[in-house]
Curated annotation (Swiss-Prot):
GO terms for biological process: 'de novo' cotranslational protein folding; cell division; chaperone-mediated protein folding; protein transport; protein unfolding. Gene3D superfamilies: 3.10.50.40, Trigger factor ribosome-binding domain, Trigger factor, C-terminal domain. Pfam families: Trigger_C, Trigger_N. It is found in: Cytoplasm. Belongs to the FKBP-type PPIase family. Tig subfamily. It catalyses: [protein]-peptidylproline (omega=180) = [protein]-peptidylproline (omega=0). This is Trigger factor. Transmembrane segments: none annotated. GO terms for molecular function: peptidyl-prolyl cis-trans isomerase activity; protein folding chaperone; ribosome binding. It comes from Thermosynechococcus vestitus (strain NIES-2133 / IAM M-273 / BP-1). Involved in protein export. Acts as a chaperone by maintaining the newly synthesized protein in an open conformation. Functions as a peptidyl-prolyl cis-trans isomerase. Residues 432-450 have a biased composition (Low complexity). Residues 430-473 are annotated as: Disordered.
Amino acid sequence: MTTEPRSNSQLLATIEVSGTHSQQVYNQVVNDLLRHTQVPGFRKGKAPRQLVLQQLGRERLRYLAMEKLIEDAVKTAVEKNNIPYLGNLELAGGITELLDQFHPGENFSFSVTFDVEPEVTVTAYKGLTIEYNPVTYNPATVEKLLQQHQRQHATLIPVEDRPAQWGDDVTLKLLTKDENGEVVKELSADELPLSLDEDQPFLLQEIPAAVVGMAIGEAKTVTVSVAEEAEAPRQLTAEIELLGIKVPELPPLDDAFAAEHSEFSTMAELRAYLEQNHQERAKHQDKQAKEAALIDTLIAQNPVELPKTLIRKEADVKVRTTLMQIQSQGVDLHKIMTEELYERMRQEAEPAATKEVHSRLLLKAIARQEGIEPTPEAVEERLNRYKEMLGNKTAKNLEQLRKLAHDEVQQEQTLSWLLEQNTFQPVQSDVATAEPTATAEAPTEIQTEAVAQTPSQPQKRSGKKASSAPSQE
């Protein structure tokens, strides 16, 4: 076998097979077919040889024999020469031309291309100055979170003697129509509860400002826009009628509030916990921001020819993960999934998959160059986590899971080592701030509500829910 490197981590291999071996493979294919081919009037495997050969056709036999010969020869050559074969095997030249050259009992030569693991040597990875967007703890974060929960537990008092204003909770009748005057049911509701909060975006973003100043029973028509992916925003018409106004009466943020809505007995204890929690969150997010900037820098300064096989495999993993998440929400994938949809999802996942493969190869190479190797205890600890998550499913693929645990721990340790070897410099006037989101360690009720109250689905404290209403985003 002779080999020649090609682009994108491919190898062109030319393999020659002896006439003796080509005849052996041909005979093997014929004998297998004789044993398994059913000929009318004969039991399987008992039909005369010539009759079976006549029924199958000699061209088909030669093709099947050539196909097996190529497959076996490539596998043997790869193993014998210790080639890091990945896949994506393609014949060099046309099938018809190659079949014309194949004659059992004669020497046979063919060429194939296939993906191999790239040889990666990283040169620029230490002593770099890397700009990133830092995440810093903002003391106002905790106060904002507490105010959100204070608002959630407010008592809503109906008012009738004034128009709606910012901070009110209102109930609307909403009728949204498209450009043709057709009702958009998904964006219409007989009774829609809405908080008039300037910091809480609404899907139809023009509605809250239009409601401010309206009196109960008043109606108006507003032009609204809805953004659509890859298209210009749709211009719709919204007919709104104000049905009711309620003003929130906020409970005091005192010890009683803390005791009722958290695991702590005093507000001071709750504040102290939340401050520590969000300081740790900001620190963790800042580290993640550094890691992301580091990866981008490594990729930019250390190009690697990536094999399509690895990119496709990683893209498939991302698509399957997305589909599992969709399925976990109760969606029947059999009703929506098609080959065309899967292929489109895979293509959309390829850019992220390419970056993931590139970064993983670089980190693995750096670990090899610097001798970063996780201890057996660290690998075993990570493996035990997988076992707990997967339960009885681990027995069949234990070694595969062990390798995954090793690679994951090694990558984390390599990233930590790289953070110490490089200097990180904040991008000027572009500083991110940790937002008041809850963590698993938050006090029980505070945690639950903070998780539930996302920008897309705010919790309501009173009022009726519409059967089909647009959500706040």
